Amino acid sequence: MTNFCNEWVSYSQMIKRFLSLMVLNTVCYQASALELNVYLWEDTIAPSVVEAWHKKTGVSVNLFHFDNDDERSLLMLKSVQLPFDIMVLDNVSAFIFSRQNVFEDLTALPNRANNDPMWLQACGTHAVPYFWGSVGIAYRKSLFDKPPTQWSEVVDIAPAHRGRVGMLKDSVETLLPALYMLNASPITDSIDTLRQAYRLLDAANPHILTYEYVLSYVRSHPQTDNLHMAVSYSGDHYSLNRFFNTQDWDFSVPEGRPYLWVDCMAVNSVSPNTVQAKAFLDFLMKPDIAAINAEYIRAASPNYKARALLPVEHREDLSIYLPEQRLAEGIIDSELSAKNLSLRAKIISSVTYQYEAKP
């Protein structure tokens, strides 16, 4: 959940997919003002929260999903006007697009103050924190003697798991495991280090099952039993267990400084429904609503008043909330230079091209 690079995403394919989505769902800005269109990750809002909002206001909420931050960010860069009233985006993109005056100022929302200052600062003035978490490894407990504790386990893959590993296609997360293996920061701009990481990923490629986001992969592939573990985001294992109706999936944050993601919500300035959109975000930040949402999604809430309402087992779940010491050591997603992004884009393009060319 991080920065974007636009060289390795097929823009034409994305636009075809996006237009199909619009046709199928008849999304347009001529739609009723009693509808809000929200662009977000899969499985990241509780149905009961959407129902409670509709019951209270009469305003419907239409949900549209993206698979990775780069896909969403490229679409935003290339499109003059998007048919979404509200967008979920990483903290880096929130600042980038806020500088372009495409989002509404949200500092006046009353319930914004319910969030911890750390996460408010991460999202800035034109977005509000929605959830946060860490990048780690989702894995099937029945197939492992012990949880994965090293990032090398998804790069230098043990024979039993070869061809069964999922990666992420993202300008930071794709390279992250290899960079940690090299004792480097996942956001390093060292050309030599990035090239070393490329060589590690290239060697791992024959043993990678997919570069598709794990939640999207299991929904779109019938042979989901092939997947043993995947680079993923905290909370994803709960979605996997819900999807498979099992308790086999778990989540591990390997050793080293945790890499933290922050999801923010923003209101599109060209939306005709900015009043309702802001009201919806304020509704989501009510402590009781934020608590319901966090418990359903099984993600870390930035809302300290909501956390006080959550069950003890949620607050003490170390797969959701990092221990304080590890949180203090965490690296929060930050903006990469154009040169860094360009090199990463070339690396990822080469890695995924070689992956797709596998026999």
From Swiss-Prot:
Cellular component GO terms, alphabetical: periplasmic space
UniProt keyword annotations, A-Z: Periplasm, Signal, Transport
Pfam families the UniProt entry points to: SBP_bac_8
Chief location bin: periplasm
Null mutant phenotype: Deletion mutants form biofilms thinner than wild- type and show greatly reduced surface accumulation compared to wild-type.
Subcellular location: Periplasm
One Gene Ontology biological process: polyamine transport
Signal peptide segment: 1-33
A molecular function (GO) term: polyamine binding
InterPro entries: SBP, Sperm_putr-bd
Protein's UniProt keywords contain Signal: yes
Family in the record: Belongs to the bacterial solute-binding protein PotD/PotF family.
Protein role: Acts as a sensor of norspermidine and enhances biofilm formation. When complexed to norspermidine, could interact with the periplasmic portion of MbaA to regulate its enzymatic activity.
Name of the molecule in the record: Norspermidine sensor
Gene (name only): nspS
